[in-house]
Amino acid sequence: MSFVSRFLSFALLVTVLISCGCQPPRDPMLDLLDVDLTKTKQDDLNRTMALVDSEIRFEQKEFSNNMATGLNRWAETRGSELDDQSWREDELTKELMEASGSLDIAEGFKDLSFFNTDGYYLQQSNWISQIANRVTDPEIQMAPFELYRMAADNYKPDEDVEAPLVEVVKKLHPEMGDDAGQTVANSMSVFDWVVRNIQLLPDSNLTDGEQEEARLNDSETAAAAGIPGVGYQRYPWQSLLYGQGDYVDRAKIFMLGLRELGIDSVMLATKGENGSLVPWAVGVVVGENYYLFDSKLGLPIPGEKLGSIATLDQVRANPELITSLSLTNEESLADNTDYWVKPEQLDDLVALVYTSPESVSKRMSNLEAALPKELRTDLAFSTSEIAARLPAKEGVAMEPWDVGYQTHEFRQAIRNALEKKSDDVISAKLNDYYFNEFYIDNFVVYRTARARFFKGKFGLDSEGRSLNAIQSFQRLKYTQEQIDNLGSDSDQQRRLGIRKEAEQNVTDFNTEVRSVQGQMNLIRRDAGLFLAQCHFDNGSMNAAANWLKNIKAEDGVDRWNDGITYLLGRSQEKLKDYDQAIEILSSDQLQQSHGNLIRARMLKEIVNGL
């Protein structure tokens, strides 16, 4: 029988079998191929996601390009498998998406392809997840909360107490059960980390004339025009990387950290004179209550019992909880010592649910579902579902918060302007970028050190192949000799990514060296505070205090004076040198002085009552 005859006979047999409802046996090789293909797809995804947590010293642009390329390759190989029919457009963010139509990332939220900025979003989620889970570890969770421990009748936990901070919270809130106590304790831990490690910047409240001077383009909205404003100038990952942010930047990181822990929260906003919304305090959902955390004050809003945290219902019922947040003349001689919110403003609030173009996109929903458990973070979330879980309160409306969209608009304006940096007028308007961001964006080992800190990598590598966070920042405390000798130090050049190309002339090489030397001067100024933060997080309060005292006297650290002073006060508080802590926190020359003085007041009252 010829090959053609045999093939036709086989085809006829298959047809008969199918018509009878029977199927021919599947070739086992096909099963093996399917398994191999599935494994290849997953390996491809794992390799790409490994870049998020990698210590390979990528340039930022190289990192974002590699992430987008890898994710899009994975998305293309998955094809129709990725088309999750259960995904639905988020109803509450439709208007935000339409209003942000000029953004590619908003326009493409229904697509499966990834954008170059998505790598930063994934890295941000990874960093915040590691921070939130690390600081809520019961074994270390209690360490920063000396003030609250003393307020809880000088509580001294027995060795067999598994979650001492939860016990402190329950003592300060006698009506609270274990689950609620755990939620509040975890919220305190994430909030406290953010306040300690993100130095508070002043609000960007520009006059009309200053706004026009700062304008980068003709867009109608301030954010899209590149005009600085409160809360939208930095992505959360940038605030983490730079170690600075305004009170809204702090709140965003706090809320995202809570989300990683499965805790709902909103930004409660008051109404301004022109009807605009003014962010006030983060309301953490615990049962039917909003527990209040003020990121500008740097404190949970105190309740009636010393050391307790107030709820929205409580401050509405007892206006004195708000008015008592104003400072006395003995505490401060500042021109305005009033707390920035009045009790009557609390009758008409808006609960803002934090969202972003990425979090409601189809691509992030599919990616999160495909990630293995050990790599999974909270990438996608429905604003509508969060809103449905919020406690209903009279006089509290609910809206999605547009700040995440405004950030994309602002950063797009900056990116477009940087392409026109040869224009002297535009270049002058970018001074803030060059002064505060450029040197960090281009200094790879700095970013690696920060990432090690976020992960809590404080232990020694037994094989000696990788530095921990403390060692990384110690290495960044460059001596003047190291900076001066960079041009002849080939080892240091290699570590900093300086390579003299064969075709590069001496003048260009020397120009590059001088640029890096300038960056080294700025980096060593920053590294001292970051090193002290590592020691504090690692429970070494003496080491933190010693470092802070030393660097306070260094030249050029004025940029970090707020962070140094606050962390030194907190270190002395933990070391039980309460008088010294009160004195340090009582300085009224800092951006966070108002909240520090309230903390000093609380600490003094607690110590006097022991």
Show which residues each predicted segment covers.
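Short solvent-exposed coil/turn linkers within tandem alpha-helical repeat scaffolds
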Residues: 514-522, 552-561, 586-607
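Hydrophobic/aromatic-rich core segments of domains that either
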Residues: 168-181, 186-196, 203, 224-231, ...
